Swiss-Prot record:
The gene is ANKRD35. It comes from Homo sapiens (Human). Residues 423-434 have a biased composition (Low complexity). Residues 295-344, 610-696, 733-810, 851-968 form a coiled coil. This is Ankyrin repeat domain-containing protein 35. It comes from the Eukaryota. PANTHER family: ANKYCORBIN, DUF3447 DOMAIN-CONTAINING PROTEIN.
Length: 1001
């Protein structure tokens, strides 16, 4: 079994698959370590040789995780970095199949951890794709490159995010992997994680600085892909990240996909919320309610406008630099044109000066060089050189000069197009011009009369007709015919390269303008002016390209007519004839003052070529002036943009940017509001404590009311049963005090009466009466009656002694009266004892009431003091409440003003958005035009490559012709010197005669 690759006509056996290789592959497939060791030690089988399926024993062992077999094969000389058909190494296969032990063995034996397969994926890509965290850790420990891009432009971190492998993402981020890299579709790792629906990976990426607002090529951000999943945790993480981003200065608008996900009436179960504002956690919403929403919104808008200004300033600086670069390029171009014109003037100025000694009849308008018009001289000399060199090449091909490269046509082409000569043509021309000048100088010192230039035919004195016939022939340039188009092609190549550079700069500017970061700035007047300027520049570049194409076509057609005529003249020329020599002598240019080379029908052709050159020169000068005008317009456009930016900055500072004093005042107001809020909370706490104390005191007062006597309570309830005011309490207490005083007075009177009674009863007790208690007034009255009765009895006994019955009755009455008196005295004693008891109880009760009254007075005084403090606190709280109400009204007024300004800002934002959409549409149209122009540019680049090859070939021919030209000049100079001295070889003389004869024909 063998495999042969045929890459040529002969088939060569590249790899021969023998039976030993097959046995080794089968042993590895079975995992037979002993068999693998035996076969590998024989050296008859190669472990890395591929079979017909593109697999080898070494790669199979790595993919199956056979660590022992892998170690044996490595010990027997297996190439550790060999690749299979897919370009995968053993390390790739081990990471694909998630074999960390094999990965460890391969890395220890020196496997290349940064090798890439056909998909440009490294082992770290496949380890991240398979979710093998151990392999990722091993590769990171061996310093594998973390941010390598595969064919899809994805890094290992992006692949791990797409697979939802949070552990691998954590390892890569800890090792320093870049989190905001995007693939070919402009999708970042966060967008891929949201597309997968992995909330854990998204949270990890956001914690490491992932940009939640980045969008892909379709214009969708991470939240758009998260809304297609049902993971609310993922929504919450993204919305919190966007909220933090909005707080940092970028305003968060309502996401367009949220409205489509939620129903217009009320959201369904499991559907995302209607807006990113409502989807935030409740805790975050409560925090936002505590904050001032108007001031926060104003601050966000201010930060957004400030960032727009910064972006506009950066863009203006960039455009200014581009304008400066273009201005410098145009200035260099103008300087090069002037230098080329000066060089042409230096090269051609010697001819009118030399011919001026014989008068101005030699060349009419010979001082045109001093007037800045060398094109007439250049056109005539070009035609003469072409014709004369063709004639010389027909007579003697060996001595045919090829020196047109250092003549004026090459330079006039570059002067016409405003470009300097290529570097490969510059050095050979300088020695040629020096040689010409040396030859001219020798002729001046020898003859003392005329200067003969190799590039132009000059006149001779009348006495030297033969010399004038010899010297009247100037070497022509056969190479001049292809040099003109070649030079023009080289010029077109350079101009196209410059045009390509301009297009690249324009594309870069377009890309910068079309990026989402610049969307906010597209609606400004400055962006509209910049777009209009770019449109003008695009139209001008198209016109310049059309002119260059026209010039190229005209210059490719122009040289064909004179060259064809020259070739026809050369074919008609016969070898030397005496008659032709005589005709040539008659037509000596010095006698008639007409330029050389204007012979016969060729004079009209020379005039035609001259007219074409003049027309092309005028057209190209016009294009040069147009370019200069465009440069001036660009400068004016730059100044106008600077003025607009300054006005925009002033407007933003005037309308959107708050003054420093207002900002400081706003900060102070916020601090004062915070302090007032804290004080209000403290006052609320103090008020609550006072309320509790007042309630306790009210309960104490109610207890006092309950302790008051029933008659006082009845009077209070009768007056105002529901009112328990302090005045009523004071009245009751004063009444109670008065009653207490009256009771004390009554008690004092009773005590006095008691003392009087005791004093009155003490004399009655002395005669032996057994009465212990003092007699009452009735008893005294009875005693008086008894005394009277006794007196009457004595009187009656005295008067009526005889009436015993009446006396017995009277005694009985007396006894009865005595019993009644005793009975009355007993009753009086009992009443006295009861009175003493009552008096003691009244005294004890009065003492208790006195103590209670003292306690009540103390409580009353304390309550009065507390009530005073409460009244002061209530008054202070009312005053502070009034201040807070005034501040709240002021803040409400400011909030209403800010709301009005925010509405104006929203209207302005809507207008800017409309302008932005309009500009985006215009940019899309321009991008389509740019694509078409790029296609044309590709076609032109192909032509440029062809022209470049032709130019290289012509450069080689130019070098050969210059060498021949130098030899011809040296030989020709010697012959001229010999002719001037009066002797010449016969062969040379014959050759010159032949040349003159051909010139006449």
């Amino acid at each position: 079994m063998k495999r042969i690759f045929s890459c040529s006509s002969t088939q060569v056996a590249v790899e021969r698959w023998n039976r030993h290789d097959q046995k080794l592959l089968e042993a590895v497939h079975r995992g037979d370590v002993g068999r693998v060791a035996a076969l590998a030690s024989r050296k008859s089988a190669r472990p890395t040789k591929l079979d017909s399926n593109g697999q080898s024993p070494f790669h199979l062992a790595a993919s199956k995780g056979l660590t022992e077999c892998l170690t044996i094969l490595l010990a027997n000389g297996a190439d550790i970095n060999s690749k299979n058909e897919d370009g995968s190494t053993a390390l790739h296969l081990a990471t694909i199949s998630c074999q960390p032990q094999c990965v460890k063995v391969l890395l220890q034996h020196g496997a290349n951890e940064d090798a890439v397969d056909a998909e440009n994926r490294s082992p770290l890509h496949w380890a991240a794709s398979s979710g093998c965290a151990s392999s990722v850790l091993l590769l990171c420990d061996h310093e594998a490159f973390l941010d390598v891009l595969d064919n899809d432009g994805r890094t290992p971190l992006m692949i791990a995010s797409l697979g939802g492998h949070a552990a691998i993402c954590s390892q890569l981020l800890q090792r320093g992997a870049r989190v905001n890299v995007t693939d070919k579709n402009d999708k970042s790792a966060l967008i891929l994680a949201c597309e997968k629906g992995s909330a854990e990976v998204a949270e990890l990426l956001l914690s490491h600085g992932a940009d939640a607002g980045a969008v892909d090529s379709t214009g969708h951000d991470a939240l758009h892909y998260a809304l297609h999943t049902q993971d609310k945790a993922l929504w919450r993480h993204l919305q919190q990240a966007l909220s933090r981003r909005r707080r940092g200065g970028q305003r968060l608008v309502q996401h367009p996909d949220l409205a489509s996900q939620a129903s217009p009436s009320e959201p369904q179960a499991g559907s995302p919320p209607k807006s990113s504002w409502r989807a935030e956690p409740e805790e975050e919403q409560e925090e936002k309610e505590d904050e001032d929403p108007c001031s926060e919104e104003w601050r966000w808008k201010y930060e957004e406008e400030r960032r727009k200004v910064v972006r506009l300033e950066q863009e203006l600086v960039q455009k200014t630099e581009e304008c400066k670069t273009q201005a410098a390029a145009y200035l260099d171009l103008e300087n090069q044109i002037r230098e080329q014109a000066q060089e042409l003037g230096v090269l051609l100025s010697w001819e009118p000066r030399a011919s001026g000694k014989q008068g101005s009849s030699l060349r009419p308008g010979g001082d045109g060089m001093e007037q800045g018009c060398p094109k007439d001289l250049l056109a005539e000399s070009t035609q003469e050189l072409k014709k004369q060199q063709q004639a010389a090449a027909t007579v003697n091909p060996v001595l045919a000069p090829k020196k047109a490269e250092d003549s004026a046509p090459g330079k006039i082409q570059y002067e016409v197009h405003g470009r300097s000569q290529p570097e490969e043509q510059g050095p050979p021309q300088s020695p040629a011009s020096e040689t010409i000048r040396k030859a001219t100088g020798q002729q001046l010192t020898t003859n003392g009369a005329q200067t003969f230039g190799p590039d132009h035919a000059d006149q001779l004195p009348a006495g030297q007709k033969e010399s004038s016939q010899v010297l009247g022939v100037e070497p022509g340039g056969t190479v001049a015919e292809p040099v003109g188009p070649a030079a023009m092609n080289q010029l077109l190549l350079q101009l196209r390269e410059e045009l390509a550079a301009v297009w690249r700069e324009k594309d870069a500017a377009r890309g910068a303008l079309s990026r989402p970061v610049m969307e906010g700035a597209l609606g400004t007047p400055r962006a509209e002016a910049a777009a209009a300027a770019w449109e003008k520049m695009e139209a001008r570049l198209e016109r310049v390209l059309a002119r260059l194409e026209w010039a190229k076509a005209g210059l490719q057609v122009k040289p064909e007519v004179p060259s064809q005529e020259s070739r026809e003249g050369a074919l008609k020329a016969a070898p030397g004839s005496i008659k032709q020599d005589e005709e040539k002598e008659k037509r000596v240019p010095g006698a008639q003052g007409e330029p050389l080379g204007a012979l016969g029908g060729e004079k009209a052709l020379g005039g035609l070529a001259k007219g074409q050159l003049e027309k092309e020169m005028s057209v190209l000068r016009l294009s040069n002036s147009n370019l200069l005008e465009e440069l001036g317009e660009l400068g004016r456009e730059r100044q106008r943009l600077q003025r607009e930016l300054q006005s925009l900055s002033q407007r933003l500072q005037r309308e959107f940017v708050p003054k420093p004093q207002a900002q400081v005042q706003l900060q102070q107001l916020r601090q004062s509001v915070g302090l007032l809020t804290n004080e209000l909370a403290m006052e609320k706490e103090a008020t609550e404590k006072l309320r509790k104390l007042l309630a306790s005191q009210s309960s104490g007062l109610r207890g006092l009311w309950d302790c008051l006597p029933a008659d006082l309570v009845g009077e209070r309830s009768a007056q105002s049963k529901a009112a328990e005011s302090l005045e009523e309490l004071r009245a009751c207490i004063s009444t109670l005090v008065d009653r207490h005083r009256e009771a004390q007075q009554v008690l004092a009177r009773l005590q006095e009466e008691n003392q009087q009674l005791r004093g009155s009863l003490s004399p009655c007790r002395e005669p032996g009466t057994s009465l212990k208690a003092p007699a009452s007034p009735q008893v005294a009255a009875l005693e008086q009656d008894l005394g009277k009765l006794e007196e009457e009895l004595r009187a009656v006994q005295a008067t009526m002694s005889g009436k015993s019955q009446e006396i017995g009755k009277l005694k009985q009455l007396l006894y009865q009266a005595t019993e009644e008196v005793a009975e009355l005295r007993a009753r009086e004693a009992a009443s006295l004892r009861q009175h003493e008891k009552t008096r003691g109880s009244l005294v004890a009760q009065a003492q208790a009431w006195g103590q209670e009254l003292k306690a009540l007075l103390e409580k009353y005084n304390t309550a009065c003091r507390e009530v005073g403090r409460l009244r002061e606190a209530v008054a202070e709280e009312r005053r502070r409440s009034g201040d807070l109400a005034a501040q709240a009204a002021e803040q409400e007024r400011q909030a209403s003003e800010m709301r009005g300004r925010s509405e104006q800002f929203e209207k302005t934002a809507e207008l800017l958005k409309e302008k932005m959409e309009h500009l985006i549409g215009a940019c899309r149209d321009k991008e389509a035009k740019i694509k078409e122009l790029l296609k044309k540019l590709e076609q032109l680049s192909e032509e440029v490559l062809a022209i470049r090859g032709e130019n290289a070939r012509l450069a080689l021919q130019l070098q050969d012709s210059q060498k021949n030209h130098e030899e011809i000049i040296s030989t020709y100079r010697n012959h001229l010197l010999n002719a001037a001295r009066g002797y010449m070889e016969h062969e040379v003389y014959n050759i010159l005669l032949q040349i003159l004869s051909m010139e006449e024909e």
